[in-house]
Amino acid sequence: MEPVDPRLEPWKHPGSQPKTACTTCYCKKCCFHCQVCFTTKALGISYGRKKRRQRRRPPQGSQTHQVSLSKQPTSQPRGDPTGPKE
């Protein structure tokens, strides 16, 4: 192994960067391209911010659902309507 200039930052050492740029392809060759590609593509690990999912807004005419609930009959009491016997 050849000596490395100690003044160089570790990420600038020869051999630390792949010769080709990373791509968005998920084939086997590209998944094993470099350590970053392996962790993100092959293992599916990403430490970036997660995108917030937007809640689906109901359509503008959604008031009919609320109206239909109020038109439903009230629940009927179950059991003996005269009450408990003593």
Curated annotation (Swiss-Prot):
Cross-link (Glycyl lysine isopeptide (Lys-Gly) (interchain with G-Cter in ubiquitin)): 71
Effect in UniProt of substituting residue 39 to M: In strain: Clone pNL4-3
Motif (Cell attachment site): 78-80
Compositionally biased spans, kind Basic and acidic residues: 1-12
Main location: host cell
Ranges for region Interaction with human CREBBP: 1-24
Chain positions covered by the region annotation Transactivation: 1-48
GO cellular component: a single term: host cell nucleolus
Cysteine-rich, as annotated region: 22-37
UniProt superkingdom: Viruses
Binding site for Zn(2+) 1: 22, 33-34, 37
Xref: Pfam families: Tat
Chain intervals with Polar residues compositional bias: 62-77
Swiss-Prot/TrEMBL site (Essential for Tat translocation through the endosomal membrane) positions: 11
Compositional bias ranges of the Basic residues kind: 48-58
Residue segments, region Disordered: 1-20, 47-86
Keywords: Acetylation, Activator, AIDS, Apoptosis, Host cytoplasm, Host nucleus, Host-virus interaction, Inhibition of host innate immune response by virus, Inhibition of host interferon signaling pathway by virus, Interferon antiviral system evasion, Isopeptide bond, Metal-binding, Methylation, Modulation of host chromatin by virus, Modulation of host PP1 activity by virus, Phosphoprotein, RNA-binding, Secreted, Transcription, Transcription regulation, Ubl conjugation, Viral immunoevasion, Zinc
Gene Ontology terms for molecular function: actinin binding; cyclin binding; metal ion binding; protein domain specific binding; protein serine/threonine phosphatase inhibitor activity; regulatory region RNA binding; RNA-binding transcription regulator activity; trans-activation response element binding
Residues the record lists as N6-acetyllysine modifications: 28, 50-51
Miscellaneous section: The infectious clone pNL4-3 is a chimeric provirus that consists of DNA from HIV isolates NY5 (5' half) and BRU (3' half).
Subunit structure: Interacts with host CCNT1. Associates with the P-TEFb complex composed at least of Tat, P-TEFb (CDK9 and CCNT1), TAR RNA, RNA Pol II. Recruits the HATs CREBBP, TAF1/TFIID, EP300, PCAF and GCN5L2. Interacts with host KAT5/Tip60; this interaction targets the latter to degradation. Interacts with the host deacetylase SIRT1. Interacts with host capping enzyme RNGTT; this interaction stimulates RNGTT. Binds to host KDR, and to the host integrins ITGAV/ITGB3 and ITGA5/ITGB1. Interacts with host KPNB1/importin beta-1 without previous binding to KPNA1/importin alpha-1. Interacts with EIF2AK2.
Function recorded in the entry: Transcriptional activator that increases RNA Pol II processivity, thereby increasing the level of full-length viral transcripts. Recognizes a hairpin structure at the 5'-LTR of the nascent viral mRNAs referred to as the transactivation responsive RNA element (TAR) and recruits the cyclin T1-CDK9 complex (P-TEFb complex) that will in turn hyperphosphorylate the RNA polymerase II to allow efficient elongation. The CDK9 component of P-TEFb and other Tat-activated kinases hyperphosphorylate the C-terminus of RNA Pol II that becomes stabilized and much more processive. Extracellular circulating Tat can be endocytosed by surrounding uninfected cells via the binding to several surface receptors such as CD26, CXCR4, heparan sulfate proteoglycans (HSPG) or LDLR. Neurons are rarely infected, but they internalize Tat via their LDLR. Through its interaction with nuclear HATs, Tat is potentially able to control the acetylation-dependent cellular gene expression. Modulates the expression of many cellular genes involved in cell survival, proliferation or in coding for cytokines or cytokine receptors. Tat plays a role in T-cell and neurons apoptosis.
Protein name from the UniProt record: Protein Tat
Organism in which the protein naturally occurs: Human immunodeficiency virus type 1 group M subtype B (isolate BRU/LAI) (HIV-1)
Encoding gene, per UniProt annotation: tat
